[in-house]
């Protein structure tokens, strides 16, 4: 099994959106052997469900997110791929675990966009724009993981 974690600050907007989208895309593409998680580097929202804006956008696109609650990224976490939403999250992850073993990337490294960071819709309220960024990056990320981890599609 391959473990993938999406990480943002509070784990209520961007990373749970990415977790839900990634899970759905893996199902759509009939790819098994991948566990998908989301975590936050801040403690403010622990145990809370995704933000209402994240829930709304996922519901509009018929992407399930049942049972998701905010969890903290911890030094003991062991993931094969850690996908941060922005440079601040990369820095926080490296501070939490300086000896991180998993492969650490920013999500937009897998996009064709000029931006390098996914903006936090908690502050911008642009959940649709963030959805588009995440959705457009997930298939390229899946392609990378399938090749890198020698997984089979279909």
UniProtKB/Swiss-Prot annotation:
Its EC number is 3.1.3.48. It is an enzyme of class 3 (hydrolase). It catalyses: O-phospho-L-tyrosyl-[protein] + H2O = L-tyrosyl-[protein] + phosphate. Pfam families: LMWPc. The keyword Cell division does not apply. Belongs to the low molecular weight phosphotyrosine protein phosphatase family. This is Low molecular weight protein-tyrosine-phosphatase PtpA. It comes from Staphylococcus haemolyticus (strain JCSC1435).
């Amino acid at each position: 099994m391959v473990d993938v974690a999406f990480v943002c600050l509070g784990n209520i907007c961007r990373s749970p959106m990415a977790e839900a989208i990634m899970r759905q895309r893996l199902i759509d593409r009939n790819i098994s052997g991948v566990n998908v998680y989301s975590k936050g580097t801040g403690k403010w929202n622990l145990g809370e469900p995704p933000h209402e804006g994240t829930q709304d956008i996922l519901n509009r696109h018929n992407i399930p997110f049942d049972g998701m609650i905010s969890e903290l990224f911890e030094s003991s976490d062991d993931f094969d791929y850690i996908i941060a939403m922005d440079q601040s999250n990369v820095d926080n992850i490296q501070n939490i675990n300086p000896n991180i073993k998993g492969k650490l990337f920013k999500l937009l490294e897998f996009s064709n966009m000029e931006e390098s960071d996914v903006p936090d819709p908690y502050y911008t309220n642009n959940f649709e724009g963030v959805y588009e960024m995440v959705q457009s990056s997930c298939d390229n990320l899946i392609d990378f993981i399938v090749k890198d981890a020698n997984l089979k599609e279909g």
